[in-house]
Amino acid sequence: MKPTAEILASIIEEVRPLTGQGKVADYIPALAKVPSEKLGIAVFTNQGEVISAGDAQEGFSIQSISKVLSLTLAMGLYQPNELWSRVGKEPSGQAFNSLIQLEMEHGIPRNPFINAGAIVVCDMLQSRLSAPRQRLLEFVRQLSGEPLIAYDKVVAASEMMHSDRNAAIAYLMRSFGNFHNEVIPVLHNYFHACALKMSCVELAKTFSYLANKGVSVVTGETVITPTQSKQTNALLATCGLYDGAGEFAYRVGMPGKSGVGGGIIAVVPGEMTIAVWSPALDQSGNSLAGTRALELLAQRIGRSIF
């Protein structure tokens, strides 16, 4: 079955009670103010059709979903052996901001979708781009077809003021020789990426290349190679939801990436990209109602990569 506006609307109503459960991210003050009852879902098909329900047009802080965009940019700037010598491809099983594993594994992050891995990727972008922050913004605007997408400066500043742990991660990696630039400018870029403000519709359109063998459905241009697209989806399926990746694969069965702003993107290769948003999080830092919405959608349209 294909997704329809009626299916999405019924899912929104069914999962709405879950918005009262879970907890909005409060360690970033600007995120703590977002109303927990917000709930949206959008589907963007490989034919270019948008289907949505709930608060799908409202912008929110995409947070760790941006890690996929940073990795995509890095894939175009580095040879595979260069990229994957500095960050791994394995699930971590630890909290997304863990220092212990990083110390044990000599400054090489487990994967690009935990904080340490994404910070290394931002360090790599800093080495090859004269203005990485501007390049990322242009990249997102191009992929989404939305020229007004911007960074939420309040969120970025809020994160920078509470950046001790991420700075510790960066300095620890530098002590192992796996960080090549000044820490503070790279962290500024990292926090700005996390502070991209986008809606479910914009996110679903942005990541269409992952459902279309590396070619953007919006622009028709090649973003990454078919092999890189397949590899990115494999990483999303195993590492995209922090230490809740196994649970998500079991319940939803799609490659996905979450953020503590309450957003999740999911990919049905060859068919569509999906984005959901609900700010209240489970214990792994993933959207509680958003995960359930994706689970119901997967069941109702009969889609899974497994």
Curated annotation (Swiss-Prot):
Q: Which reactions fall under this protein's catalytic activity?
A: L-glutamine + H2O = L-glutamate + NH4(+)
The record's listing under Gene3D superfamilies reads: DD-peptidase/beta-lactamase superfamily
Question: What Enzyme Commission number does this protein have?
Answer: 3.5.1.2
- Cysteine disulfide partners in this protein: none
Q: Which InterPro entries match?
A: Beta-lactam/transpept-like, Glutaminase
Query: What keywords appear on the UniProt entry?
Result: Hydrolase
Q: Which domain of life is it from?
A: Bacteria
Q: Which GO terms describe its molecular function?
A: glutaminase activity
Query: What PANTHER family does its record include?
Result: GLUTAMINASE
Q: Which HAMAP family match?
A: Glutaminase (MF_00313)
What family does this belong to? Belongs to the glutaminase family.
Q: What is this protein called?
A: Glutaminase
Species, as recorded: Vibrio cholerae serotype O1 (strain ATCC 39541 / Classical Ogawa 395 / O395)
Q: Which gene encodes it?
A: glsA
